[in-house]
Amino acid sequence: MNVIEVKNLSKKYKELTAVDNISFNVKEGEILGLLGPNGSGKSTTINAILSLIKSEGSVKLFGKIMSPENYEVKSKIGVIFQEVAVFEELTVLENIDYFCGLYIDDKKERTKYVMDALELVHLEEFKNFYPKQLSGGLLRRLNIACGIAHKPKLIFLDEPTVAVDPQSRNNILESVKNLAKNGAAILYTTHYMEEAEMLCDKIIILDKGKIIAEGTSDELKSLTNIEEKITIESENIENKTIEKIKKLKNVEEVTYLNGTLLITYTKGKNNLVDLIEFLKANKIRYDKIFSERPTLNDVFLELTGKELRDWCLPIILNTL
């Protein structure tokens, strides 16, 4: 079942088109990653889906047209924005209980939900702490617990791991995976390519408000012309040798700096084998050699013009 159905969604700010006629679906238990440079339209897309801003096109959530007054649909949604939104005067436990109570009236049921949320983000030992006593990573985990305590079937996560410690980051990613395993549909925005690669079932790359690529991580990697990067550590590679390497089959680019030779290949087979044979034939000694396949970051940089553009777009961070 499609939990999110977006068709021909657009949003304009005077002369600027922030979201340009995009369409996509998200199913139950699926994690969709939205990637793009700053100002590419990620946050605007979320705000439009949630009816926090007016837009053109069609948005259906759980098969129903989304609108600001559709409280039945809103009760099934959890939203975790990048900015932490909790009450400083309440403890961790009280904060989660408050936000859960906006949806769950029954006290016994709510208590169970709150404890489940605490366990999900591993904050049990901090339940009586106040927000000011928590690290940045723990605060973000609290923020997530508050957003998902009522067990929503659709969850929006906007850059949830920005500026957190590695332990909290791993915990957050584990929590997101568990939420999807339990059937929640998740729309996840991030700047971290490795997160999207590890976490998301499908990925959409946005640039200038348009979808420029979508698919699984492997499908997106197949779009890049870069097939392989080989790095060689050697202090005795002459310019004439570098010129010969540039003429080898499938070689796209060669750079040599401070004893490190980096060779970028286009698609092709046996690149590493051919290179080693060349080095042996030319009696070139080297200390280390290793190969690296293209990453999602390579795809992202290639498709978006290899620069992260900052636009001045208004970002509306209202809560539901």
Which residue ranges define each predicted feature?
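Conserved ABC ATPase signature
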Residues: 89, 130-137
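Conserved ABC transporter NBD signature motif
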Residues: 57-68, 73
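ABC transporter nucleotide-binding domain
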Residues: 173-266
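Walker A (P-loop) phosphate-binding loop of ABC-type ATPase nucleotide-binding domains
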Residues: 37-41
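Conserved ABC ATPase "signature" region
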Residues: 97, 101, 108-126
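Catalytic Walker B motif of ABC-type/P-loop ATPase nucleotide-binding domains
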Residues: 155-159
